[in-house]
Amino acid sequence: PFFLGCGIYLPHLPWYLPGKYFDMHPLKKIRLPEHRTDDFDDIPEGGKRMASRAGGIIRESGKWREAVQGCLAAASFADACVGHVLDALKRSPYAENTIIVLWGDHGYDVGEKKFAKSALWEQTTRTPLIIHVPAALGGNPAAKTCTRPVSLLDLYPTLIDLCGLPPSQTSSQLDGRSIAALVRNPQVKWPYPAIITHSPHWHGPNHAVRSERFHYIH
């Protein structure tokens, strides 16, 4: 057995990447996200401080469309990098015996709530998460979408569970829980919310609770 942790830097800033990925997203076809000028009128000062100052600068400079293009181009480049890794796996003898987890550490605002991360709103806390378990390991060959809220803290106990490894002596001290049941059946009952904490070094600490229906920010 082997474990490969492959970190792809993009689409994190700076967006330095081959021009062909920008060409995949022509400026004239870029759709800007909805932005309300009064969006922050009903939130406390702490919430306003969370919002990146870059949002106003980018819009005022007239480069909002270019900023969205850069983010899309960087995501396309990262997608191509992931493709190279998956192609190599398919050519290997391990393709049908390897669990694949694709995830991002945070979301990103491109104008909805100003710009960047460093906040607890939906755009910045909702991350990509795809888990593939081969049929030989009990996985479901049909791709399915799960709407249950989960946390990145759940990945470690989930991999332990999916690999059939015994729980460690410290498993009871983990903050996350295995979501293997959701991987096998996305509709299984799941009463647990996702808990998000914003770094105390960035205008915090602040916390959020995300259930399937509600998103509460404190």
Regions found by a protein language model. Name each.
Residues 1, 5-149, 162-171, 217-218:
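Active-site-proximal cap/lid insertion segments
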Residues 106-112, 141, 153-156, 161-218:
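C-terminal cap/loop subdomain of S1 sulfatases and analogous C-terminal strand-loop tails that border
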